[in-house]
A protein has these predicted regions:
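Conserved class I S-adenosyl-L-methionine
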Residues: 17-26
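Conserved SAM/SAH-binding beta-strand->alpha-helix loop
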Residues: 49-51
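Conserved small/polar residues in nucleotide/adenosyl-binding loops
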Residues: 217-222
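Conserved SAM-binding motif I beta-strand of class I
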Residues: 42-47
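Conserved SAM-binding loop of SAM-dependent methyltransferases across substrates and taxa
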Residues: 27-39
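C-terminal substrate-binding/active-site "lid" region of AdoMet-derived donor-dependent transferases
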Residues: 102-151
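S-adenosyl-L-methionine
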Residues: 1-18, 32-33, 54-82
Length: 222
């Protein structure tokens, strides 16, 4: 396995497509490791700029993966090969991810791994409005920041999702990292409310309490 960040390792845990595409590939660590780990049979390292593709090509060649991984100069997912069944879009803001998704030719059954570094609510809202179901989520902590990873699939109908889930995750893995994230968010909003009275922040605290209550009820029923 090629050494990589904790964030990339967490993303790799949910890579399982036969043919994957890593959008904004940087050094192609995700797609190359997926091949080396026998999680995928082939893949594409994609970027809108030539520089990252040159870095990706170097990684591919150094690990003797030229028969399995190809580089593609693409604007998002436009022009992506039809054999791709899982697309990874991570390490960018939600607005850019949404822009990429909005320009793609999405079909039922196509799967995504998504991870934004800000505006999580906007991303989940877009997915909900466009029949992209969130199968599961997990929260990771890397270099002082929390990042959600969303495992998604395109469907032909809308997914039921609450406001609490839009804000703080759908089918989220309830581990210590996520619980620490909830504590961090709650303290942040309480600190804001101590200085200015804004109902929307009180509402978010209530959503966090709702999630904790649901988790407690699930543990009781086990």
């Amino acid at each position: 396995m090629i050494p990589c960040s904790n964030r990339i390792q967490e993303i790799l845990e949910w890579v399982n497509g036969n043919c994957i595409a890593d959008i904004g590939c940087d050094h192609a660590y995700v797609v190359c490791n997926a091949i080396l780990n026998h999680q995928s049979k082939k893949g594409y390292a994609c970027d809108v700029a030539q520089g990252p593709l040159d870095n990706a090509k170097k990684t591919i060649e150094e690990n003797h993966l030229s028969d399995f991984v190809s580089c593609r100069l693409l604007d998002g997912i436009q022009g992506l090969s039809d054999d791709v069944d899982q697309i990874i879009i991570c390490g960018m803001g939600a607005k850019l991810i949404i822009d990429i998704l909005s320009k793609g030719n999405l079909h039922s059954g196509l799967r995504f791994l998504l991870s934004s570094h800000k505006d999580d609510f906007a991303l989940r809202e877009y997915l909900h409005d466009h029949n992209i179901h969130i199968v599961r989520e997990k929260m990771i902590y890397d270099h002082g920041h929390y990042y959600p990873i969303l495992d998604c699939i395109v469907k032909d109908h809308i997914q039921n999702i609450s406001f609490a889930q839009l804000h703080f995750g759908m089918n989220m893995k309830m581990d210590s990292t996520y619980l620490s994230y909830l504590d961090f968010e709650e303290n942040k909003y309480k600190n804001i409310l101590s200085k200015v009275n804004k109902p929307e922040f009180l509402e978010k605290i209530e959503y966090i309490k709702e999630i904790r209550t649901r988790r407690s009820e699930e543990h009781t029923s086990e």
